[in-house]
Structures are given as C-alpha cells and as structure tokens.
Design a protein with these regions (language model features):
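Gly/Ala-rich phosphate-binding loop of Rossmann-like dinucleotide-binding domains
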Residues: 21, 25
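Acidic-histidine catalytic/liganding microenvironments
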Residues: 81
C-alpha cells in the first residue's frame, strides 16, 4: 500500500461509492465514506444472492480487470481497509473551498444502537411492539421499529427507526450487551478537511 497522500470524501455508499472508496484507499488517500442511510450498498444490498449461482450481488457487479478471477475482491470485506472510515446516517450539509482543499460540513443522526456493542442477536426486535412495512422487501413483509436494515450489514448491528418507534424502552431493557441507549444527543454537526497533498 502506498503512503497516505491526502484525504477524500465519498458521498453515497452504494456500489459505485464503495468501489470509489476502495480505489482511493488503495491509492493512499484517507477516505471518509458517508451515506444518509443506516446501511451500505444502496439498492444492490437487496440483491444479496443472485440466480443461478448464488454469487454475492456486490461481487457480481465488480468489473473484471484481468482474465484471472483472483483480480477481483470482496467489496464488503474490502471496507475494513485501514484508510476507510464509514459514517452511516450522515449527510453532507455544506462544501466550501477550492480544488485540493475543501471543508465539508456533515450532519449525523443520533445512534441509538452502539454498533461496537451490538452483537446482532435480535432480542430487541423480538420484543418491539411496532410493526411497519419493510422497505428492504418492497413493503411485502413487516419489520419492527428496531431492525437489521439489510442482511450482512456493515457493521452488523440493528438500527432504530425513530419515525415509527414509540420509545417504550422494551428493547433497551432486554439488550444483553447494553448496546441500546435512548438518551441520545441531537444531530451532530462536524467539519472535515478534504485535502490532496499533491495539489497544495
């Protein structure tokens, strides 16, 4: 891997955003990958396994650079790259500056479930009294107010839909690791510097 040469902000963690983040990280940039959704992969995350081979939907979308299939790598596993920081439920509010030196202002929704402590056991979802249409399955099934947004989520933790949650606290009581905390801060706003050292 090359020496770090600057930083980059990739807005949108769909398939093209993920691929861009991985390419920039391999070039040596420190990458902030943000998405306003609570999960990665965009629409492609709904195509978890594809017929007829059951290959991963994300990996099937990779361009084949060489004839040797080993030139491809798993997009999900690649996101654990040391140069990539993932910020979900985050949106770009403002962008100021000039080429090579930008200041980005980001706003992040509160995290009710701590992804570092959530084990993905599903106990919380089992006691949630709220049921709503599941967007992941195009409204054909139901989900709870606390739910796993997509299979193989990165990080593999549950999220709370504050628009439908009644704040009853049942999930917080049953969580075996204490990962759920409804005493959240309001939306956090912060600024990051996006720099290309070669242009400065």
């Amino acid at each position: 891997m090359r020496k770090k040469i600057g930083s980059a902000l990739v807005v949108g963690a769909g398939i093209s955003g993920i691929r861009s983040a991985l390419d920039l990280a391999e070039l040596g940039y420190q990458v902030q990958l943000i998405d306003r959704a609570p999960h990665l992969g965009g629409t492609l995350s709904q195509l978890d396994y594809q017929f007829p081979t059951d290959h991963c939907g994300m990996c099937k979308m990779l361009p084949l650079v060489e004839r040797d299939s080993s030139s491809q790598y798993c997009l999900r596993k690649g996101l654990f790259h040391e140069n990539i920081e993932i910020m979900l439920s985050t949106e770009l509010v403002a962008l100021e500056g000039e080429p090579g030196k930008f200041q980005a202002t980001l706003r992040q929704k509160p995290a009710i479930v701590d992804p570092e402590r959530c084990t993905g056991c599903g106990e919380c979802s089992g006691v949630c009294p709220v049921e709503v249409a599941d967007e992941f399955n195009a409204g054909l099934t139901k989900r709870k107010a606390i739910y796993l947004p997509v299979p193989h989520n990165i990080p593999n933790s549950y999220t709370v839909d504050l628009a439908t949650c009644t704040l009853c606290g049942e999930c917080e009581k049953i969580c075996p690791t204490g990962a759920i905390d409804f005493r959240w801060e309001a939306r956090k706003e912060f600024r990051i510097l996006v720099v290309d050292d070669e242009l400065i």
